[in-house]
């Protein structure tokens, strides 16, 4: 299994026979090198989105049309994109599981908001979500944009993820200290990868507080387009 950061909250996850592009905001992402776009997209099988905000949906429609990839996510957002943009999609909802190239992807709760920009203001696109991605003997908890929430308790107990990809930049999501608290209290991760940080001055620039709060856990600060093998 390989997890590759695309900057901000974007990832490329190669698991089982699937290559998932998660929240692929490439164009305009200050951390993503535009001349390496093909490297990020090569072999992708699905686009997995957590919510509608532009720093997450980003290049979703362009990539879906260019590569013929289905967009996977919350029913409301995916259905709206299918109707508006004519792309393929797999819409489902909290508690549902879809199998993507042998990987089992279950949608779970997050606490944030979800909208896309429209001419008359925000267009609300269903609710925000996280995912449990199971395959190759591992379970990844992809938090999506979220704060700490009590639901993490049963989610950790039921799904037992060993890898956490946690939004931890603060201001719009939990910060590094809160992410460390959530990981300690609700999960038993072997590996934690922070995201939604370093992109703008408003967000946290270092994961040191996360590392300090999780002794005994491998906290990996991702580097853009450098694969992490699990």
UniProtKB/Swiss-Prot annotation:
Task: Kindly list the GO molecular function terms attached to this UniProt entry.
Answer: hydrolase activity
Q: Gene3D superfamilies this protein is in? A: Ribonuclease Z/Hydroxyacylglutathione hydrolase-like
Keyword list (alphabetical) reads: Hydrolase
SUPFAM superfamilies assigned: Metallo-hydrolase/oxidoreductase (SSF56281)
For this protein, the record's Pfam families field holds: Lactamase_B_2
Which Cys pairs are S-S linked?
Answer: none
Q: Which residues cross the membrane?
A: none
- Which protein family is named in the record? Belongs to the UPF0173 family.
Provide the protein name.
UPF0173 metal-dependent hydrolase RSKD131_0588
Species of origin? Cereibacter sphaeroides (strain KD131 / KCTC 12085)
């Amino acid at each position: 299994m390989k997890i590759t950061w695309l900057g901000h909250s974007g990832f490329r996850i190669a698991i089982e026979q699937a290559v998932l592009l998660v929240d692929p905001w490439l164009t305009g992402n200050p951390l993503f090198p535009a001349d390496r776009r093909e490297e990020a997209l090569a072999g992708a099988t699905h686009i997995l989105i957590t919510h509608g905000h532009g720093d997450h949906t980003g290049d979703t429609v362009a990539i879906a049309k260019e590569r013929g990839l289905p967009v996977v996510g919350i029913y409301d957002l995916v259905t709206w994109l299918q109707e508006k943009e004519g792309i393929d999609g797999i819409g489902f909802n909290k508690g549902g599981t879809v199998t993507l190239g042998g990987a089992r992807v279950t949608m779970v709760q997050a606490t944030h908001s979800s909208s896309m920009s429209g001419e008359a203001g925000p267009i609300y696109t269903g609710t925000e979500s996280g995912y449990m991605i199971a395959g190759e003997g591992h379970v990844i908890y992809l938090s999506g944009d979220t704060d700490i929430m009590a639901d993490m308790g049963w989610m950790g107990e039921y799904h037992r993820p060993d890898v956490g990809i946690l939004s931890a930049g603060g201001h719009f999501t939990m910060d590094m200290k809160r992410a460390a608290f959530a990981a300690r209290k609700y999960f038993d991760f072997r590996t934690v990868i922070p995201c939604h940080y370093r992109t703008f001055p408003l967000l946290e620039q270092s994961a040191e507080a996360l590392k300090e709060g999780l002794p005994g856990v491998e906290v990996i600060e991702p580097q853009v387009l450098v694969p992490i093998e699990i």
